[in-house]
Amino acid sequence: MKTLNRRDFPGAQYPERIIQFGEGNFLRAFVDWQIDLLNEHTDLNSGVVVVRPIETSFPPSLSTQDGLYTTIIRGLNEKGEAVSDARLIRSVNREISVYSEYDEFLKLAHNPEMRFVFSNTTEAGISYHAGDKFDDAPAVSYPAKLTRLLFERFSHFNGALDKGWIIIPCELIDYNGDALRELVLRYAQEWALPEAFIQWLDQANSFCSTLVDRIVTGYPRDEVAKLEEELGYHDGFLDTAEHFYLFVIQGPKSLATELRLDKYPLNVLIVDDIKPYKERKVAILNGAHTALVPVAFQAGLDTVGEAMNDAEICAFVEKAIYEEIIPVLDLPRDELESFASAVTGRFRNPYIKHQLLSIALNGMTKFRTRILPQLLAGQKANGTLPARLTFALAALIAFYRGERNGETYPVQDDAHWLERYQQLWSQHRDRVIGTQELVAIVLAEKDHWEQDLTQVPGLVEQVANDLDAILEKGMREAVRPLC
């Protein structure tokens, strides 16, 4: 069986206009996949040079396959049908290592056609590293490497204002573009680079903050033989991902034209502020996960897919989203409903086995950041507690007993909560405290909740009633009236 290469698999090759820091699965099934579609359907005509930003020889370089690899996108489409779509990606030209090919790395700045910089160097990548120097070949941190590359471009083109870059980080931190820009400016000042360079950074370059959303499941280890048989070639860089994707970029409106988004519709939004989109994702996608997990798991289910195929649990989650979360969010209702519909479709994806216990990690913090704001906003707006979000809190407290149908399961959270719950549930079993007292102790933890939740009218009583119902009847019976 042949391995992918451009001689045996000839096709389009595009001029290099994009630098990408990061060779991982996510960017290859997200950014490079989108660039490939735009290259095929528009005159974007842009090839990617992947820069491996860390010193590692594993996985091997994409250049061993001349930059070619296959994405397999699978999940439920807009009609709810299971689809699997294989695509040979031709947008990547080559990969270079910043450690073993430093001169080649700097030469990227000399190419007048270069226009975009994408990156995903993990959440820790956009950070300051104290020892980084201008003459390091290379510096350790990604922002320092980028500063050096930008200075190379500034010098080579004598500060020409039409030679700046559009820099689009995809790292999962808030306002990643702003954070990256601040670090680049910090290195420029620390290295005493000329004032003209600092002005050029601001005038000629755009640092765009982003929100990225796609579950990328990566190399399909267990299915490789079968998939390669179907494809008819060997591909060491096979990459799998879900059908859904969303790319929100906070940047100049002209970006839509530059990326040719006006000529081919991708799920990419160019916006003035990513904040409402971030809030939407946290409240609907992450919030639904967090409400679902303790309810579904204690109802005897193990994966998100099983939960969504269970009529009652699915109804509980959908009613929580549409009746309790969406009404208190600050974006047009139709936009929120269309996003919510995509979310529930993603939860049903038959190709992804998402274990409830793995999502349960750090459940107390997740409840505070993802559900509590909507619970409190609903109470404030209507004068009554949202029934399902309140029930989810009771289910969460019950979850920390660590026992289902007589069998124990691992609960992962910080030591404070694990010890606290062990003590509280032990006292409850010994009848030292009642359910209402247990709930009041949990809700009074100001250090965690950032407020005293026992002061929210009716919350302790409602959570205690729900918790008693769960303990007496079991989760199935207790949740039924809310389905």
From Swiss-Prot:
Keyword Transcription attached: no
Positions of transmembrane segments: none
Gene Ontology BP terms: D-galacturonate catabolic process; mannitol catabolic process
Induction entry: By galacturonate, tagaturonate and fructuronate. Its expression is subjected to catabolite repression by glucose.
The protein's Enzyme Commission number: 1.1.1.58
The organism's place on the tree of life at top rank: Bacteria
Annotated metabolic or biological route of this protein: Carbohydrate metabolism; pentose and glucuronate interconversion
Similarity comment text for this entry: Belongs to the mannitol dehydrogenase family. UxaB subfamily.
HAMAP family: Altron_oxidoreduct
Listed name of the protein: Altronate oxidoreductase
